[in-house]
From Swiss-Prot:
GO terms for biological process: symbiont-mediated perturbation of host programmed cell death. It is found in: Secreted. Keywords: Hypersensitive response elicitation, Secreted, Virulence. Belongs to the HopAB family. Residues 81-90 have a biased composition (Pro residues). Residues 31-41 have a biased composition (Polar residues). This is Effector protein hopAB1. Induction: Transcriptionally induced by HrpL. Residues 1-93, 175-259 are annotated as: Disordered. Effector protein that plays different roles depending on the species and plant cultivars that interact with the pathogen. Acts as a virulence determinant by enhancing the development of disease symptoms and bacterial growth. Acts as an avirulence factor by eliciting hypersensitive response (HR) and plant resistance. It comes from the Bacteria.
Length: 516
C-alpha cells in the first residue's frame, strides 16, 4: 500500500506511513534526531503542543500563525470549562424555621450567645448547659437531641447557627456604637424604623433594645437635664439578667410545686432523698413506687447517660429536698432518741439517716451521710452510726483522708476573678441574697462563707499553666469543692460530662474563685 503524503504550513513536509509499509534507510537516518512529534511512528500529541514547538523557529509564516490560532481555538472549544462547585444552600423553609426558633428564644429572654455556643457543643458531642427554657424550645425542633444529639450535617442546625451568629454580631455592633442616652430622647424617624423592621436582624434589634420610658415631668419639661445617663449596654444587660432570673425562678417554682405535692401525698422525704442521692451519685435507679410518684408530679426520674446533671429536674428536686430536710434539723435533734430496728443500738441524731447498704463500709456510709446532712461534721456523722467510741477516731481519720485528697488541692488551683465568674452567671449569696448561685450539690455559694471552697468546674480540661478560656474549658459550673469531694468519694465521675474525675486530674478542670 502506498503511503500518504502531504504538505503542512510553510511547505513543511509531513508524511504518514501505512502500517505495513517498510521504513526506508533515509527515513531512519533523518528521523534519528527528529522530535518524537514528527516521528512517522506516532501521531502529533495535540495541535497546541505542536504549535508551541513550531514557535521555537525564528521565522513563522502567516499561514503557520493562522493554523496555530485555528487549532488552539478549536481545542479550547472542544474542552468545556469546569464550573466551580457551589456549596449547598439551605432551603427557604429551613431559613424560616431557623428565624422562628431565634424569635422564640428572644421572646423567652434566652442568652443567644450561650445558645449559639451550646448548639456548637452539642453538634460536636461536647458538654452542654442549656437552661430549661432554651432546652424546651430546641427540643421542639430537634426531638432526638436528648438521645442522639444534633448531627453536624443537619441543614436546620447549621442555618440556626448562622442566624444566631448574625444576630449576636448585630447586637454586639449595636452595643459598641450605641450612644449614651440623651436626657430628652428624640422621636425616631418613621421611615428608618420601618426599614429596620423589614429585615430579620432589624426585628431582633428592636426586640433586644431596652424600652425607653420617661416620667411625666420629663415629658412636660424640655429643659430638664438627666445628670446620670445610663449606657444602652448596661440597660440591655440588666434586661437579659432579669429574663434569666425569671427563667430560674420559673424552674424553682416548678420544683417547689412538685415538692409540695409530694409532701401532701405523704411521701417519706428521707427515703426519697436517699433514693435521689443514690441515683445521682451511684446511678442506682429509684424504687418503682417513688418513680411513679415523681412522674405523677411531672418529673422524669431518669437521667440519660448523654445528658449532663446540670439544670436537670431530678438534681433540682434533690437540692430543694436537702434544703427542706436541713431546715428540720433543730426539730429532729430535739426529738426523742430511738433505735431504728430491733437489735440496733444506733442513735438517730442526724436529720437524714437512711439504712446502710449491704456493700457499704464505714467510710462509704459516712460519706453518704455527709452528703445527706450538709450541716453535720464528720465526727458527728461517725458518732451517729459507730456505737463503739474507741473505733470512731479511725473511721473519722479515714473519711478525712478520702475528702482531703480533693480539698487539699484548693489553694493550688488556677484562679478566676469574681468579676469573670459573674460573667459566667455566678452570684455571690452575700451580694444577691434573693437570687444566689446554688452549689451543684446543695447550699448557696458565697466567697465570704469560711466553710466553703468556691470553685468553677469546667467542662473540658486544660493544662494547669494556662488561664481559664471559655473556648478551651467551655462553660463553668460553680460549686463547693468540699461537696464535690463527697460526690467523688462515692463516684469519681465528672457531673457535667460523665468522664472520670478524681484527685489526679481535678486540677485540670477546677478554678478557684477569688475576690476582685
Amino acid at each position: 500500500m502506498s503511503g500518504i503524503n502531504g504538505a503542512g504550513p510553510s511547505n513543511f513536509f509531513w508524511r504518514w506511513r501505512a502500517d505495513d509499509e517498510p521504513v526506508t534507510e533515509r527515513e531512519r537516518d533523518s528521523s534519528s534526531g527528529a522530535n518524537l512529534t514528527n516521528s512517522p511512528q506516532l501521531r502529533p500529541e495535540s495541535p497546541t503542543v505542536s504549535g508551541r514547538r513550531l514557535l521555537r523557529s525564528n521565522a513563522l509564516s502567516r499561514q503557520t500563525r493562522e493554523w496555530q490560532e485555528t487549532t488552539s481555538a478549536s481545542a479550547e472549544r472542544a474542552t468545556p470549562p469546569v464550573e466551580p462547585r457551589q456549596p449547598p444552600e439551605a432551603q427557604p423553609a429551613e431559613r424560616i424555621v431557623a428565624e422562628r426558633i431565634v424569635q422564640e428564644l428572644v421572646r423567652a429572654g434566652a442568652n443567644l450567645n450561650n445558645v449559639r455556643t451550646m448548639l456548637r457543643n452539642v453538634m460536636d458531642n461536647n458538654a452542654v448547659a442549656f437552661s430549661r427554657v432554651e432546652w424546651n424550645i430546641l427540643l421542639q425542633h430537634f426531638p432526638d437531641m436528648h438521645t442522639n444529639g444534633i448531627s453536624s450535617d443537619s441543614v436546620l442546625a447549621n442555618e440556626l447557627r448562622q442566624t444566631l451568629r448574625q444576630v449576636v454580631h448585630q447586637q454586639r455592633t449595636q452595643r459598641a456604637l450605641a450612644p449614651i442616652l440623651s436626657p430628652a430622647p428624640s422621636r425616631p424617624v418613621a421611615s428608618s424604623s420601618r426599614s429596620s423592621q423589614r429585615t430579620l436582624l432589624g426585628r431582633f434589634t428592636g426586640w433586644m433594645a431596652p424600652r425607653q420610658t420617661s416620667s411625666s415631668s420629663q415629658a412636660t419639661s424640655s429643659t430638664s437635664v438627666d445628670r446620670h445617663p445610663q449606657d444602652l449596654n448596661q440597660l440591655e444587660s440588666l434586661r437579659l439578667a432579669d429574663a434569666e432570673r425569671r427563667n430560674r425562678s420559673a424552674n424553682q417554682t416548678d420544683t417547689d410545686e412538685a415538692l409540695r405535692r409530694l409532701t401532701q401525698a405523704g411521701v417519706d422525704m428521707e427515703r426519697l432523698s436517699t433514693s435521689l442521692g443514690r441515683y445521682i451519685h451511684s446511678f442506682q435507679p429509684a424504687p418503682p413506687d417513688l418513680r411513679r410518684l415523681l412522674e405523677s408530679v411531672g418529673i422524669d426520674p431518669d437521667i440519660p447517660e448523654e445528658l449532663t446533671l446540670v439544670n436537670n429536674p431530678v438534681l433540682n428536686l434533690n437540692v430543694a429536698l436537702n434544703r427542706m430536710l436541713a431546715s428540720r434539723q433543730a426539730t429532729t435533734e430535739s426529738s426523742s432518741v430511738f433505735p431504728s430496728r430491733a437489735g440496733d443500738t444506733r442513735v438517730r441524731t442526724l436529720p437524714v439517716m437512711p439504712e446502710r447498704e449491704d456493700n457499704e463500709n464505714n467510710v462509704a456510709y459516712g460519706v453518704r451521710l455527709l452528703r445527706l446532712n450538709p450541716e453535720a461534721e464528720v465526727e458527728r456523722v461517725v458518732e451517729a452510726f459507730i456505737t463503739d467510741p474507741s473505733s470512731r477516731p479511725e473511721v473519722v481519720a479515714d473519711i478525712h483522708a478520702v475528702l482531703r485528697s480533693i480539698t487539699s488541692q484548693f489553694r493550688q488551683l488556677r484562679t478566676i476573678s469574681k468579676a469573670d465568674a459573674e460573667s459566667q452567671d455566678f452570684r455571690d449569696a452575700a451580694d444577691y441574697p434573693d437570687d444566689p448561685t446554688s452549689c451543684l450539690f446543695g447550699e448557696d455559694l458565697s466567697l465570704s462563707n469560711p466553710h466553703q471552697q468556691v470553685i468553677g468546674l469546667a467542662g473540658e480540661s486544660t493544662d494547669i499553666l494556662q488561664p481559664y478560656s471559655q473556648e478551651g474549658n467551655k462553660a463553668l459550673r460553680f460549686m463547693d469543692m468540699k461537696k464535690l469531694a463527697e460526690h467523688l468519694a462515692s463516684k469519681p465521675v465528672h457531673p457535667m460530662n460523665r468522664d472520670r474525675l478524681d484527685d489526679k486530674n481535678i486540677a485540670g478542670y477546677a478554678f478557684r474563685v477569688v475576690p476582685d
